[in-house]
Amino acid sequence: MTGILWEPIFVLIPSDPPTAPRWLDVVNISRNSAELKWTVPERDGGSPITNYVVEKRDVRRKGWQTVDTTVKELKYTVTPLNEGSLYVFRVAAENAVGVGPFCELEDSVLAKDTFSELEKNLGGL
């Protein structure tokens, strides 16, 4: 095999941001907080997911407010909320390439306690 030159071949595997998280839901709401949960994106884009970005928006406003960009779990409690305001939430996954598309709640939720103090007291009868 003399006279044959071997050269290394480099293969680049393209990576993309992850797809949107799935099944975003508000599992608990109070007058000043909302507990969110979601499931992992269908695809990580070829690079492990490093964290999630959580945003909120008061429906009376146009712009989104970033709540946290370093969420590591598949749940997060958003605080503070203004009692009596309607909110929508969204979550995006991030990997080494960047932030993917957001998964957004379809319906707004009202920031209020689930049970009033009177209802709590009557429940003990």
Each predicted region: which residue ranges?
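Extracellular low-complexity, O-glycosylation-prone stalks/linkers
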Residues: 1-125
